[in-house]
């Protein structure tokens, strides 16, 4: 009668020699993985310098790290291919093969191989559109309200408008040259003895002493003013001494003016253009008070001549 020896099983997972069994199991796992063609050691991520390879990584038949000598259809070119062969691109031979030359003036030439027959054709070069030599003027900006200040905006807009319209400026300058410089207004005050108010007139609007006298009469219609044209007419050259004296005696009021030297003179003693340039103020005074002005007027006219 044979006695069977009970086999001892480790149900908990513990053994007397855990280290040895773990080593044996790892060796068995590595052997099984190598037999199956899997190399997990080579695919582990490790720390190291850029470009360095782990000595434990071994190229297998399934993981080829070296560049294939024959290009595969649809594969991307690496950096060395782009440098060494910059003028051509090559696809793997198959049903259709295309090879093009880059940089030719007539466009890329393409060779197509289909069913053992080769056909080469050249694509027409795409014409390059020439840039317009005359650059279009920038559109004017919309008016800005607020900040920045409007004064600077107006200054810039005026400068741009002047630069955009050179023809109009030249036409304006020619018109101004023909018509002459625009003369400013020459306003002087007019006072009269006995009148409680003053008036102002523009001497540039009158062409002679007669027009000035008529205008002053309309301003002060309640007073009688000596007419410069009643004694033979007073033109643009003024009056002589006898006519000035007759004017003072035959009228109640006469027109005098203050010149640049602050002297009071009778109106009509000098030519009209000289009177306009030298007149600072007009005053209508009584003829009895202006009798002494006539001799002084003639003396001053003689000294000027």
UniProtKB/Swiss-Prot annotation:
<dbReference type="InterPro" id="IPR033389">
    <property type="entry name" value="AUX/IAA_dom"/>
</dbReference>
<keyword id="KW-0804">Transcription</keyword>
<comment type="subunit">
    <text>Homodimers and heterodimers. Interacts with phytochrome A. Interacts with TPL.</text>
</comment>
<protein>
    <recommendedName>
        <fullName>Auxin-responsive protein IAA27</fullName>
    </recommendedName>
</protein>
<dbReference type="GO" id="GO:0009734">
    <property type="term" value="P:auxin-activated signaling pathway"/>
</dbReference>
<feature type="region of interest" description="Disordered">
    <location>
        <begin position="96"/>
        <end position="119"/>
    </location>
</feature>
<keyword id="KW-0805">Transcription regulation</keyword>
<dbReference type="InterPro" id="IPR003311">
    <property type="entry name" value="AUX_IAA"/>
</dbReference>
<dbReference type="Pfam" id="PF02309">
    <property type="entry name" value="AUX_IAA"/>
</dbReference>
<feature type="compositionally biased region" description="Polar residues">
    <location>
        <begin position="155"/>
        <end position="170"/>
    </location>
</feature>
<comment type="similarity">
    <text>Belongs to the Aux/IAA family.</text>
</comment>
<keyword id="KW-0539">Nucleus</keyword>
<dbReference type="GO" id="GO:0009733">
    <property type="term" value="P:response to auxin"/>
</dbReference>
<keyword id="KW-0927">Auxin signaling pathway</keyword>
<dbReference type="GO" id="GO:0042802">
    <property type="term" value="F:identical protein binding"/>
</dbReference>
<comment type="function">
    <text>Aux/IAA proteins are short-lived transcriptional factors that function as repressors of early auxin response genes at low auxin concentrations. Repression is thought to result from the interaction with auxin response factors (ARFs), proteins that bind to the auxin-responsive promoter element (AuxRE). Formation of heterodimers with ARF proteins may alter their ability to modulate early auxin response genes expression.</text>
</comment>
<dbReference type="GO" id="GO:0005634">
    <property type="term" value="C:nucleus"/>
</dbReference>
<feature type="domain" description="PB1">
    <location>
        <begin position="185"/>
        <end position="287"/>
    </location>
</feature>
<dbReference type="GO" id="GO:0000976">
    <property type="term" value="F:transcription cis-regulatory region binding"/>
</dbReference>
<dbReference type="InterPro" id="IPR053793">
    <property type="entry name" value="PB1-like"/>
</dbReference>
<keyword id="KW-0678">Repressor</keyword>
<feature type="short sequence motif" description="EAR-like (transcriptional repression)">
    <location>
        <begin position="45"/>
        <end position="49"/>
    </location>
</feature>
<dbReference type="GO" id="GO:0003700">
    <property type="term" value="F:DNA-binding transcription factor activity"/>
</dbReference>
<feature type="region of interest" description="Disordered">
    <location>
        <begin position="155"/>
        <end position="180"/>
    </location>
</feature>
């Amino acid at each position: 009668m044979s006695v069977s020896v009970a086999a001892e099983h480790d149900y908990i997972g513990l053994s007397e020699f855990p280290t040895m069994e773990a080593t044996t199991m790892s060796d068995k796992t590595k052997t099984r993985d190598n037999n199956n063609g899997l190399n997990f050691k080579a695919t582990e991520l490790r720390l190291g310098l850029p470009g360095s390879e782990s000595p434990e990584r071994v190229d297998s038949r399934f993981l080829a790290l070296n560049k294939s000598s024959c290009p595969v259809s649809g594969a991307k070119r690496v950096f060395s291919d782009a440098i060494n062969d910059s003028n051509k691109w090559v696809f793997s031979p198959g049903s259709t093969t295309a090879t093009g030359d880059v940089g030719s003036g007539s466009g890329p030439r393409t060779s197509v191989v289909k069913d053992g027959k080769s056909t080469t054709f050249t694509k027409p070069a795409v014409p390059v559109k020439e840039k317009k030599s005359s650059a279009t003027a920038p559109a004017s900006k919309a008016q800005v309200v607020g900040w920045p200040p409007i004064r600077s905006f107006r200054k810039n807009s005026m400068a741009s408008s002047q630069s955009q319209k050179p023809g109009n400026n030249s036409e304006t300058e020619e018109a101004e040259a023909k018509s002459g410089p625009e003369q400013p207004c020459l306003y002087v005050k007019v006072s009269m003895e006995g009148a409680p108010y003053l008036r102002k007139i523009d001497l540039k609007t009158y062409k002679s002493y007669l027009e000035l006298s008529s205008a002053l009469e309309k301003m002060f219609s309640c007073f009688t003013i000596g007419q410069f044209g009643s004694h033979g007419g007073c033109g643009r050259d003024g009056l002589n001494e006898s006519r000035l004296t007759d004017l003072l005696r035959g009228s109640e009021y006469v027109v005098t003016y203050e010149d640049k030297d602050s002297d009071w003179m009778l109106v009509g003693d000098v030519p009209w253009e000289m009177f306009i340039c030298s007149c600072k103020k007009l005053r209508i005074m009584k003829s009895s008070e202006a009798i002494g002005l006539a001799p002084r007027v003639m003396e001053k006219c003689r000294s000027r001549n």
